[in-house]
């Protein structure tokens, strides 16, 4: 038995199915009861901060008419939230079976444009009033993102000695380019907008994995 939002729930009545997640420290389960489903999200790291961001940014998107999972209940101290289930049909699945992909990609690009037209808000609240501050995009953040290439991909295609040389030269060039950037910090950036994070929900497009958004 567990207590959720003041109600005692018998977990023995639920069917719980693990869901293959993304490359993160979150674990996902689908709970099924009377043919209705919800998603449990467990965070193994930065429990409170990570899950408040997850639900607060989803709430912000919903308020701006972008479909994102709603929060049903939470236990931030134990690193758990229960959210709306958008199913298994991602646009990755849809596109892999379609020959003519243009119209689908157009829909997705139109959605991206709509997201980037949202008036950004620094402080956002989740469905229960908990606050999250959306951070600015910075040159430091850009370096972190480009480092993923050096840490994960480059070692797979070249030997270590050569990899270190390429890394040093490329980082120097990137550093020079990043210094020239003028980051206005005036646009909402999802940062994980790709077909596996875009779900088909009847005639609509649902957006997931929005917790790392920046301005």
Where are the predicted features?
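ATP-binding glycine-rich phosphate-binding loop
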Residues: 11-32
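Glycine-rich loop motifs involved in handling phospho/adenylate chemistry
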Residues: 16-20, 45, 137, 190
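Alpha-helix N-cap/loop-to-helix initiation residues
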Residues: 24, 47-50, 215
